[in-house]
Design a protein with these regions (language model features):
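N-terminal domain-start motif of subtilase-like serine proteases
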Residues: 10-12, 61-62, 78-79, 103-158, ...
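Hydrolase catalytic cores
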Residues: 236-237, 321, 365-428
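Inhibitory N-terminal propeptides of secreted protease zymogens
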Residues: 8-108
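Structural recognition of the beta-strand scaffold that forms the well-ordered cores
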Residues: 19-22, 62, 69-73, 92, ...
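Substrate-binding/access-modulating region of protease and related hydrolase catalytic domains
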Residues: 145, 151-152, 168, 233-330, ...
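Subtilisin-like serine protease catalytic core
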Residues: 90, 143-181, 185-246, 260-263, ...
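Catalytic-core environment of secreted peptidases
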Residues: 171-178, 339-385, 422
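Residue-level detector of functionally pivotal "anchor" positions at catalytic/ligand-binding pockets or at interdomain
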Residues: 439-471, 479-480
């Protein structure tokens, strides 16, 4: 017998009685500027259907207009009654109560949210060596910042698991904070001591700090990659469980980002295996089409957003490959390198299961400088989690310099500026982008954004392999 903690995703047959377009004035303006038409995916889920399943005893946790459904909590009696509803097309189990009763062992949890702050005590000394700008230098981002483009006018979302002290951290520009939403069951203070992973990722984008050793010559700067961008925070990670329900939380965040008119969403999360093995993905599922997260990523791209997603830290583990939603098409998945540009051994491998180059880009994810939300000092940590926001902020700065560009034009310029663009690699992808080159490229040769996979070669263990052309997808992320 199922308990009230069993969670399902219900997919409805249609949107009868729905006449609400779920887009803010800001989002509508963005759509108009970019010529993106309103379609059925922009309309809310039928309120009639939501009322009906609520009256049957289900608790609606959140809805999905893109997938025309709702994530609900229900017991067996309620779900049997819902099965009789003609407007319910499909029912998916996403979490059972067995995995809610105890926090699973750390080894079974997402590696992406495991961070290390072992160098926190050395933070200020690291800055004295000029470490605070190293990750910007590697991306050749400083010339764009010096030209005055630091993400102003660009709205960035961060989807993560906790934002400890992000509401008060001195190094963050709080006047640029747009708001936050908790899409989890935790319903705890997202700024409390329930996780700082999101805060660390946020500092890589918007934090700014001047550091001095007491002399004029000893003044140094920590800077994020888009210190003038506005930002919105989404908590999508459940602390006690690892289940597909978290993917539904994330999809809800991406849909909300679209409704708010955000330009970019940075996601340092990934999914491969879960607390209950029958939910697990296989590598074959990392095809940009199987998970709702990957499908939602493609829809977001069609709606004008640029999603930037961490590849994962499985390169030296049994899984080895990328996670979802990093497998999605039309996004930027991000691998990790060190300060010398060498690939981090933990950075997950591509390509996607259907042969597309993954990751698209790399940034510093080994020894990344961040601001500690605990005490506002500069620390270093490792993970594609921290390479990801560097690229998200870089894209925001580039977009602020080219405000008329589309999301796919920004994506393509970034990819084409990479140092391995002509010979992508299974861990580097197209390599490390050159921001200034991407910017200057736009003034001379705006890229053909329809050419999403310009090369079908990849280097594996020093050998050259020829890949088949990546599949194309329709707006729902289904393979054509």
């Amino acid at each position: 017998m199922w308990s009230l903690l069993t969670i399902f995703f219900l997919q409805f047959a249609n949107k009868a009685g729905s006449d609400i377009v779920c887009l803010s004035p800001t989002a509508l303006e963005m759509r108009e500027e970019r010529g993106i038409a309103i379609d059925s995916l922009d309309y809310a889920v039928s309120p009639l259907y939501l009322d009906s399943i609520s009256h049957l005893g289900a608790e609606v946790l959140h809805t999905s207009r893109w997938f025309n459904g709702a994530t609900v909590e229900a017991n067996e009696q309620t779900i049997q009654a819902i099965k009789q509803c003609t407007f319910v097309d499909t029912i998916y189990l996403t979490r059972t109560d067995e995995e809610s009763s105890v926090i699973p062992p750390l080894s079974l949890r997402k590696r992406e949210v495991i961070i290390g702050e072992g160098q926190e005590a050395k933070g200020e000394r690291l800055e004295a060596k000029g470490e605070g700008l190293k990750q910007l230098v590697q991306l050749n981002l400083l010339p764009l910042h010096q030209a005055g483009y630091k993400g102003q006018g660009i709205r960035v979302g961060i989807a993560d698991g906790g934002f400890y002290n992000a509401d008060s951290l001195e190094s963050l520009p709080h006047d640029q904070w747009l708001g936050y939403t908790d899409l989890t069951d935790d319903k705890e203070d997202i700024f409390g001591q329930t996780g700082n992973h999101g805060s660390l990722c946020l500092t890589a984008i918007v934090a700014h700090k001047e550091i001095s050793d007491g002399t004029l010559a000893g003044t140094f700067t920590y800077s994020g990659t888009a210190t003038e961008a506005s930002y919105y925070l989404f908590k999508t990670e459940e602390h006690a469980t690892e289940s597909p329900k978290e993917i539904d939380n994330w999809v809800a965040a991406i849909e909300m980002a679209d409704s708010l008119g955000l330009h970019i969403v940075s996601t340092s999360l990934g999914y491969t295996t879960f607390d209950q093995e029958h939910f697990n993905f296989a590598y074959a599922d990392m095809n940009g089409c199987t998970s709702r997260g990957a499908q939602a990523s493609l829809i977001a791209a069609r709606k004008g957003m640029l999603l930037v997603t961490a590849m994962g830290n499985e390169g030296n583990k049994t899984w080895q490959y990328l996670s979802t939603p990093a497998d999605a098409d039309s996004i930027l998945s991000v691998g990790a390198v060190n300060k010398d540009g060498a690939i981090a051994t933990f950075s997950s491998y591509g390509p996607s299961a259907d042969g597309r180059v993954k990751p698209e880009v790399c940034a510093m994810g080994e020894g990344t400088s961040l601001i500690s939300p605990a005490n506002n000092t500069v620390i270093t940590s490792n993970g594609t989690s921290f390479a990801c926001p560097l690229i998200a902020g870089m894209a925001a700065s580039l977009w602020s310099a080219l405000p008329q560009a589309t999301n796919m034009e920004i994506r393509e310029m970034i990819i084409r500026s990479c140092d391995k663009y002509s010979q992508p690699h299974e861990q580097y992808g197209y390599g490390i982008p050159n921001t200034w080159e991407a910017y200057t490229m736009a003034t001379t040769d705006l890229p053909n954004t329809k050419h999403q996979t310009p090369y079908t070669k990849i280097i594996h263990n020093g050998q050259l392999y020829i890949l088949h052309e990546g599949k194309r997808y329709n707006v729902l992320g289904c393979r054509l």
